[in-house]
Amino acid sequence: MSAYLEVEGVEKRFGDNWVLRGIDMSVNEHEVVCLIGASGSGKSTLLRCINLLEKVDGGCITINGDRITDIGVDVDDVRREVGIVFQSFNLFPHMTVMKNITIAPMRVLGQRKNYAEAGAMALLERIGLAEKANEYPDRLSGGQQQRVAIVRALAMQPRVLLLDEITSALDPELVAEVLNIVRDLKEDGLTMVLATHEMGFAREVASRVCFLAEGVVCEEGPPEQIFSEPATPRLQGFLRRIIEAGRL
């Protein structure tokens, strides 16, 4: 059986800077794949390419058998299948929490307002923020804003959720409340691809871990293999630095 998400030989450059140099990666349904690697290794760019926020310069990406990188593909159709959450929240500051969550289901999915709001409230209740439905983002903590950003993505009922360093902009004491949501989504069986610097969390939740360096997947495997028996000098050096920094 073929993977639900296939990334084959994907290349991306910005000017003379090749950020992705031939990425190969597959994700099966219900898997949680964690992308690890130093800053600048291409993790965020890869996620943006999968969501079609960036156009690839080579290779192809396939979702559920359809090549989404072909010319003429409907971007909105792809983003119905593939949600993304950014490290900087990206909530609309002039909209309430409820409006932030319901605007896309109403405009893109054609949901009626009452239906979209009922779904949004159910999601907010699940993450313990129902009382914040009519607040504006600047009235929320960073952790609360990120939880709302995750709910906003979930309101579109994606088949795959991409999470781009979702804790990197948070104070340490707020990280746990966001990671707990990801744990719950894993229990639900949602297919996810996470770029993360939270090595302990990656070890806990990942089905597989992909280590990126200089725009390629240098090593991949189950978390115990990646973190306990790294095979390549690059990964060994990366983990050594992580351990020395007290992050694993």
Where are these regions (language model features)?
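ABC family nucleotide-binding domain
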Residues: A3-V7, E11-P223
